Amino acid sequence: MSAAQSTLSTNAGPAVGTPPPQVLLSARGLTKRFGGLAASQDVSLDLWRGRIHAVIGPNGAGKSTLTNLLSGDLPPTAGTVTLAGQEVTGRAPHQISRMGLGRSYQKTNIFLPLTVQENVRLASQSRELHRPWNPLHWIDLATHNEALQARCDRAISLAGLEDRRHIVAGTCSHGEQRQLEIAMTLATQPQVLLLDEPLAGMGVAEAERMVELLLRLKPEHAIMLVEHDMDAVFTLADHLTVMVNGQVIASGTPE
């Protein structure tokens, strides 16, 4: 073990007397090469339900590349990704999303002219598969719409945006827009959340609200957090991975 690695405890096991959390996503030997450049080199990690796994490192370390490899936005040169026991390596992002993975991006991805509720409802609809024709489709449609609205309402509530649901997204504050993006992700009912710098550009009060939101989401999800705000990282992280030049140089509990 290197000197850098020795600064992090590797005792990441569950507390005595509590059931071990479930591994929801595993990556083994993930490598991504662009010509002669290795943006990600032999990266392995596990994401557990009920834990927040933070990935830190300088700009260009490979953190966003890793996130894109896990979500399917980039195909790996080598290595495998397993989600909820099924290998998803090489699958399209929309397929991986429907299997239970949601993500946010460094740049907020929302529909600015639409209301908060309309944004979340669109995200909720995106997880739906095409259904065969049904002669009783009006009854089926009513049931379907109720379920869709229930997912939408729950996502808005979890994200703390109940009193903003009818506000046009473009008029929301930066922090609220980041909360909205997470609400849209939650509307797809993911088990695993990949969050790429969710606190970027936030003031103190907005950052505190985001930390509270992530702590609310933690018990039911496996979360990977890419973040430069070290105060937030050490408040939230159960496990910490440090990347430099596409490689993991340290991984363990932040003690």
Outline where the language-model segments fall:
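Glycine-rich phosphate-binding loops of nucleotide-dependent enzymes
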Residues: 2-255
